[in-house]
UniProtKB/Swiss-Prot annotation:
CC terms in the record's Gene Ontology section: cytoplasm; membrane
Protein function: Involved in unsaturated fatty acids biosynthesis. Catalyzes the dehydration of short chain beta-hydroxyacyl-ACPs and long chain saturated and unsaturated beta-hydroxyacyl-ACPs.
SUPFAM superfamilies: Thioesterase/thiol ester dehydrase-isomerase
EC code(s) of this entry: 4.2.1.59
Protein name per the record: 3-hydroxyacyl-[acyl-carrier-protein] dehydratase FabZ
Gene name of the record: fabZ
Organism, scientific name: Yersinia enterocolitica serotype O:8 / biotype 1B (strain NCTC 13174 / 8081)
Length: 168
């Protein structure tokens, strides 16, 4: 249930993103403006499955998952701005530049992701992203995401097993 037009709760996030446990990394959207920016939360819990091995005795939220959380935030912004995915359409991470990690994120942290549209061209959208904990920057990156229907070819069994016929 939405309390205002700029906040999204988990039910609405689940309606927009295909990700599910343990890979859904956005817990709530705090604010957004279509076509401009989005601010979201990831509550980092010791119960996350990757903390068993990253690292035993010194749990650290993996940097690649900070980037994934920001990428999921771009997906929510894109879907709220341009509409949901159509059947067969995909939204995927297409590139990353200038990723910088400033400090570790640990269990108990509440990570705020802020993403902004930079530009869109030929099916690719460029975003900037910043992740913060307690107002302190933990990660910055420029990300590219793509939205498209993958090319598919349908070949029947008879076409595959048909003997080559040479014309004379």
């Amino acid at each position: 249930m939405t309390t205002d037009t700029h906040t999204l709760h988990i039910e609405e996030i689940l309606d927009l993103l295909p990700h599910r446990f343990p890979f859904l990394l956005v817990d709530r959207v705090l604010d957004f403006e279509e076509g401009k920016f989005l601010r979201a939360v990831k509550n980092v819990s010791f119960n996350e499955p990757f903390f068993q091995g990253h690292f035993p005795g010194k749990p650290i939220f993996p940097g690649v998952l900070i980037l994934e959380a920001m990428a999921q935030a771009t997906g929510i912004l894109a879907f709220k701005s341009r509409g949901k995915l159509e059947p067969g359409e995909l939204y995927y991470f297409a590139g990353i530049d200038e990723a910088r990690f400033k400090r570790p994120v640990v269990p108990g942290d509440q990570m705020i992701m802020e993403v902004e549209f930079v530009k869109e061209r030929r099916g690719l959208t460029r975003f900037t992203g910043v992740a913060k904990v307690d107002g302190e920057i933990v990660c910055t990156a420029t990300m590219m995401c793509a939205r498209s229907k993958p090319a598919t070819a349908v070949v029947t069994k008879s076409e595959v097993t048909k003997p080559d016929v040479k014309e004379s």
